[in-house]
Amino acid sequence: EVRTESATQEIHEVEFELKSGSVQSLLAFSFEWVKKYQLWLDVRSKAEFGALLVANKKVSPATMAKETIFNKKESADQNLRGLIANHLQHLLPNIAAISAQVAEDEHVQQAQLALHHLHLSLSLLGDWTDQKVDKWAHQLSAFESHFKNLQHFEHMQRTLGALLQNPKTAESLDKDILYAK
């Protein structure tokens, strides 16, 4: 629970901490919990929730992309991993806001941009690593397509919804030759 003098927000969390072993083992373990208990992973911290509560806001501003600088002293694989990490730092906070159903338009746009950059990076630079990235690239392409559809759907809801709720629209359609009875 996070509280201020005038407000309270419940937080239910299970925290997974890597004390030893590989990151892959921790992720595999946490994903089993996600599936088994219908949990979802969230990158937002209790401190962020507290700051939002104090500011009387529901969501932090959308996270923007940061410039990636390649290090010529590192291997191509290490540079690609840094690039992917940068894209994920751009993507995950925006996805968290969308998943929590508190996102603003900018969160959706930035998530779509991050997905696009991540997909392009894996597609164009995937041969920089020995890891199999084809499956990731394919899944990201499908996810990216989903976001484009979501954006189109939301746009249609806003524009067509307002148009159809306007009383003059029905009147105009009755007068229109194509729709006249």
Name the predicted role of every residue range.
Residues 1-181:
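Function-determining surface determinants
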